[in-house]
Amino acid sequence: MYNVDIKKNIRIKQGRVVSNKMDKSIVVAIERIIKHPIYGKYIKRTTKIHAHDENNACNIGDLIEIKECRPISKTKSWILIRIIEKAIC
């Protein structure tokens, strides 16, 4: 065996927090824009991802950055990296 670190392609995404009611968990809505294959109109599509928030630092409306990690639970395989922008409440 060689002592070489093999890094896989780590995915990083940005999104808004839509729920923080669970302990150490958040739900993040990630928006993307796609072009309709026939009509050519640009459409917004939203994906909701469950992520791990170790310190319960996020609030609803925060813009955050998450990265993919090993599965933490049945639905969580993303972890919070940083809070980009706090929500104005």
From Swiss-Prot:
Superkingdom as given in the UniProt entry: Bacteria
Record's GO cellular component terms: cytosolic small ribosomal subunit
Gene3D superfamilies xrefs: Nucleic acid-binding proteins
GO MF term (any one): structural constituent of ribosome
The entry's keywords: Ribonucleoprotein, Ribosomal protein, RNA-binding, rRNA-binding
Keyword Ribonucleoprotein assigned: yes
Family: Belongs to the universal ribosomal protein uS17 family.
Subunit: Part of the 30S ribosomal subunit.
Protein name as it appears in the record: Small ribosomal subunit protein uS17
Lineage of source species: Bacteria, Pseudomonadati, Pseudomonadota, Gammaproteobacteria, Candidatus Palibaumannia
Gene responsible for this protein: rpsQ
